Amino acid sequence: MKLAELSKEEIQELSMVEVAYLVMKETKEPFNYQDLLKKVAELKGMSEEQMLDRIGYLYTDLNIDGRFVTLGDNRWGLRSWYPLEQVEEEITGPTKKKAKAKAEEEVDELDENIEVFDDEFEDLEDELDELAESEDSDEEDEEFDEGDDIDELDDEFEESDDDL
């Protein structure tokens, strides 16, 4: 089926995605989405307002319909034109090294902050351990001095046992 063979009424009855398919099939070249939308709207005799109202519908239909493939940069083509490997290659664009480098710098900065935090945390732990050890040794010193006579303490315990 060719667009030239169809009457205005038949084109009106076709969906936008069907008209887009016929346009691409006849021209045999990929389209920028905006250009494709304008061409479809022109063929269907749509007003500017109608076209803007349906802009998202055509885009959604192109994504869902297995006959179309996005080529990147908002360009669309027919899947039948491209072998699978070529489509994957075209879709994969050049990597942006600046953004990646900036992201790596941010990660490095975060790693440094974590290391500083870990060091501060370890220092705080060490201080708390030392403080706890010194308090423990102070309590032990108060409980029993070597000068205390063990016999006196035994006598005190025996007296308290007798009271029970």
Swiss-Prot record:
Record bears the keyword Mitochondrion: no
Start and end residues of each stretch annotated as Disordered: 93-164
Domain HTH HARE-type: start-end pairs: 14-81
Gene3D superfamilies reported for this sequence: RNA polymerase, subunit delta, N-terminal domain
CC per GO annotation: DNA-directed RNA polymerase complex
Family from the record: Belongs to the RpoE family.
Name of this protein: Probable DNA-directed RNA polymerase subunit delta
Gene: rpoE
